[in-house]
Amino acid sequence: MKDICCIGHITKDKIVTPNRTVYMAGGTSFYFAYAINQLPKDVSFSLITAMDPTEKEPVEKMLEAGIDVTLNPSRNTVFFENIYEEDQNKRKQRVLAKADPFTIRQLEHVEAKVYHLGSLLSDDFSPEVVAYLAGKGKVSIDVQGY
């Protein structure tokens, strides 16, 4: 049993500024996992994510960094386009692709004291999935997409 399990999609982000366009990985679960990985190892952690397996490079880099990651295949990877104005506090965000929602079946084998749900879009986690996990441990939810 892990102390903390973060469940959420790793995103492909297109960042557009007046000066350039870059592509990078992102998402709550991505940043959460790297932050937890910097803490002392007395807290056990795992990440459950879902993305198009042909775009799994961010997962491979996380595994190389020593992060415990389980990749569930999805038809798509969540793909955000973030367009920033000259004033970087102003942006427009578009969803260019959505990954498959997480299911109870994908999470049956997962055991943790705390489940952190890194939601990005409103249908990443059904109420049934949240209730299921709440029956197994404590649940915290990032409210960005919930």
Q: Where on the chain are the PLM-derived regions?
A:
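Short, flexible segments with low predicted structural confidence
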Residues: I7-G8, A33
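Short, flexible active-site-adjacent loop segments at beta-strand->alpha-helix junctions, enriched
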Residues: I10, L121, V143-G145
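Conserved N-terminal subdomain of the carbohydrate kinase-like
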Residues: K12-Y23, Q38-D124, E128-K138
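Hydrophobic, aromatic-enriched interface-forming segments
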Residues: K136-Y146
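Extreme N-terminal starter segment of soluble prokaryotic enzymes
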Residues: M1-C5
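Histidine-anchored nucleotide/phosphate-binding helix
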Residues: G27-L39
